[in-house]
Regions:
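Glycine-rich ThDP/TPP pyrophosphate-binding loop and its adjacent helix/strand module
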Residues: 1-168
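Thiamine diphosphate
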Residues: 1-15, 163-211
Length: 211
């Protein structure tokens, strides 16, 4: 919409994150059909498919084939192990190359992955871990932190490799933002009338309507 009116410098991706409950909502069905029909290729939706909802497991109440449904709606469908960082990265790379259709990345995930109870038993894929603090669901927080590779005595420590990763990414994003701002400034200088029109789009003011 924006790129068609104001140029390719406005071309960007829109990311949405949905859960099993979200994907079941009727409003999402209509939105999905429209997005596929219009070929909204700048839309990338990540679906956290953990088969858990508020009171039951999803497969107890729903037998839909989500992958086939979105394919029928003209979506680019990518199914991955949503607990695997490399698969997520690869899926996002592929989704950003799509130029004809919206993309849904179906990430098959495990609710409460790595969580343990006080006896060391697994709390993964438990309906009780949905919608409330894990401790209220019977998860032993210290045991879980240790199981996930952390230190229960210092649970909020930031590992050095994480600091390095985010510092590198921060630099990349600062450079990217500077480039986009320069593109915008050049476009505004060359297209003053459209630049004013764009400002009205984000001004929060209602358009004037001739009744």
């Amino acid at each position: 919409f924006l790129a068609a009116r104001f140029g390719e410098w406005m071309s960007h991706k829109i990311y949405t994150f949905v859960s099993d409950g979200s994907i079941q909502e009727e409003i999402s069905q209509g939105a999905g059909r429209v997005a596929g029909h219009l070929g909204l290729h700048n839309l990338i939706m990540f679906y956290d498919a953990n088969n858990i909802q508020l009171s039951t497991k999803v497969d107890e109440v729903d037998t839909e084939d989500i992958e086939m449904k979105y394919k029928a709606w003209n979506w680019n469908v990518i199914s991955i192990n949503g607990n695997n960082a490399q698969e997520i990265y690869n899926a996002l790379e592929n989704a950003n190359k799509e130029t004809k259709r919206p993309t849904i990345i179906i990430g098959k995930t495990t609710m409460g992955i790595g969580c343990l109870d006080a006896n060391g038993g697994s709390m993964e894929s438990k309906v009780s871990t949905h919608g409330q603090p894990l401790s209220n669901a019977g998860v032993c927080i210290p045991s879980t932190i240790k199981n996930l590779g952390g230190n229960p005595e210092d649970p909020f420590v930031i590992f050095d490799e994480v600091k390095e990763l985010y510092a590198k990414r921060k630099k990349e994003l600062i450079d990217w933002a500077a480039k986009k701002k320069a593109e915008q400034a050049a476009w505004e200088k060359q297209n003053p009338e459209l630049a004013e029109k764009l400002k009205t789009f984000f001004s929060g003011e209602a358009p004037k309507i001739d009744y």
